[in-house]
Amino acid sequence: MNLIPIFVFSKIAKDIFIKNKIDKRLLNKVAYLRSECVPVILYSRLPYSILKAKIEKLGGSIKFELPIINAWSVNLPCNKLAKIASLSGIHFIAEDSTIQVQLNIATQEINSRKVNDLGYTGKGVTIAFLDTGIYPHPDFTKPKNRIVAFYDVVNGKKQPYDDNGHGTHVAGDAAGNGYASNGKYKGVAPEANIVAVKVLDAYGKGLSSDILAGMQWVLDNKDKYNIRIVSLSIGETPSLPTFLDPLVRGVDTLWKHGIVVTVAAGNSGPNYNTITSPGTSRNAITVGAVDDKRTSDISDDEIAQFSGRGSPYLYKPDIVAPGVKIISTASGNVPFGADEIMVNKAYRTATGTSMATPMAAGAAALLLEKNPNLANIQIKNILKSTAIKIGDAGLWTQGSGMINIEEALKKV
């Protein structure tokens, strides 16, 4: 009888243990990238000086710390991943993946115009948009400038700008006041304050670490600017369990600090189990998209085909809002999608769960204006309990249904 030595079993077990500490997407890159450096997010509680020495010894470098998830943004040679993972104090190595944007009648459908007329406009509440930046559009800056802060993770610029257009559009969905259209194209919370954090480049893409750096800035400055809400119209196909997913961990940290977080369900429908990360967060208010057919009559509405769906294992989205051909603020002449159409120099249309998400953020601002003491979980529950069902679409397609701000305010 041939006996396999104990040390062989020990080595196999060790190899399995090490591989389980590395994102599978990174393991797939090892074969063809070899010694090339790749951006990773490294979970470790080692002191900076010790971690820096270990990483540099193996040819890597630390970019910056991500205390929001107890991790580091690091560049590592592909062929040294296993060596790094084997070190004591290294918990997990995740790919620093590329995230992208998730690319009126709408405000009438969710009844925000009615509550605006009653005096609820989001005044005094700040919404932070982590996106491509913001153009200083008249709908944000007149009659007074409501862009209270701008932070640029990508290029380090100080003054507000948007070299893509997506961030400007979503900010208008939530907080545009319609100044350039005499109130015609107005967002849900037209007097809310705006914080714009640029985490995506001119192509609408960015690394997870940059988005996490933006989240960290929001967390560090939430009291200074009264940031009560974060709107995230971004996403990627989930590749890790939620407890290891860097973006989900970031969202959950914001939520634990009392911030309302609205996140796009993603545009990968209509199949089930297509919710994008970080919309997979159990805490976040995940928002799907409705096609309102450009009418204020809800009876002809349908859940958009592209809107991400949940599954029996993930009860998402939480709610839905209009997300097809939404007219909102334009960033000069900067185009950001093939589906967009210029209405005039100041406005353009866009389609996606990206557009639905800030509407939910605006709704949260109206509730917080009426009662600033509401907790984020209370806001989530109010929006869900007052939502209107869209046709016979199921739970994993529409969640609780279309947000109804008029009814939601009655519960506050």
Regions found by a protein language model. Give the residues of each.
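Short beta-alpha junctions and helix-cap segments that line functional grooves
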Residues: 182-184, 247-251, 271-275, 305-306
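Subtilisin-like serine protease catalytic core
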Residues: 116-129, 134-149, 157-209, 225-228, ...
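Autoinhibitory N-terminal propeptides
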Residues: 1-69, 79-114, 118
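Short acidic, glycine-rich surface-loop motifs adjacent to enzyme active sites
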Residues: 215-241, 264
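Hydrolase catalytic cores
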Residues: 171-174, 195, 199-201, 274, ...
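Solvent-exposed loop/turn segments at secondary-structure junctions
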Residues: 99-101, 133-135, 153-154, 180, ...
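Extracellular S/T/G-rich loop segment that most often corresponds to the catalytic His/Ser-adjacent loop
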Residues: 131, 279-369, 407
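Catalytic-core regions built around general acid/base machinery
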Residues: 246-261
